[in-house]
Amino acid sequence: MSSEVLDMLRNDEHYYGEYGRQFLSNSDIGALLNNPRQFHERKPETKPLIEGRFFHTALLEPNKLGEFMIVNCASRNTNIYKDAVAQSGQEILLLKNEADELLSLTQTMKQNLRFFESIYAPGNEYEKPGIQTIKGLQWKGKADIVMHSEGVLIDIKTSGRIDDFKWSARKYNYDSQCYLYQMIFGMPLVFYVIEKETHRLGIYTPSEDFLRSGELKVEQAVEVYNKYFSPESEDSIRNYYIEEVL
């Protein structure tokens, strides 16, 4: 694994930008399985995406919070917000009340002994990139936390309803994430989850069945990629269609 490649992938602009597109990632699974026409299409910035980045940064790399522009206004319909967006050149910015709530979530995690001791254990690495050849293709991943003392990866998630997390995890392809990250980093992945409204906390450890489900998704995604997008492909995405029996 080239150290130069990993150094490039540490930078989010490279990881999520043109350089990083030479590798597949778990975020490609959804498009390849559900709508291959959207594979590698640029995804617009959304409120959940920027909230997720802010939350992770506040918890794991608080020294980088200054990179976020926060707007102190009541809503996105105000001229203050519209002017700030125009000046920033970004598609969407966080409101101060949204940032405050996200910071509150991080405080809840830090105040829980188990969460604090795991997230900030001595020797932990944060936002660590990795690449690996899996099923014949190059995949990338970026681990939130590598907890060397326990030999596990920790992935931080927020949830609208933590009671549903066990069931929604497959819907959001967390099963394929677990499989890919275990292959890339050589460690199992565990989810540390906080419910947005109530701040309830949960720890979710993948089962063998969950990992197998993820591996099957990766195999299916690789099949679609090889059919339509690989350099050796003799088919075109224009020929893609869905066929089902009603």
Each language-model region and where it sits:
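Metal-dependent nuclease catalytic cores that hydrolyze phosphodiester bonds in DNA/RNA
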Residues: 1-140, 242-245
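Short histidine-centered catalytic/ligand-binding loop motif
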Residues: 43-44, 90-94, 163-172, 207-210
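Short, well-structured alpha-helical interface segments that form or flank functional binding sites
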Residues: 50, 140, 173-176, 180, ...
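Metal-dependent nuclease catalytic regions and adjoining charged, substrate-binding loops involved
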Residues: 167-168, 180-246
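Coil-to-beta-strand transition motifs
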Residues: 136-140, 147-151, 187, 198-199
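Short, structured patches in soluble enzyme cores that scaffold and shape functional sites
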Residues: 128-130, 157-158, 193
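Substrate-binding/catalytic groove segments of enzymes
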Residues: 65-67, 153, 187-192
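Conserved catalytic cores of phosphodiester-cleaving nucleases, focusing on short active-site segments
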Residues: 141-165, 181
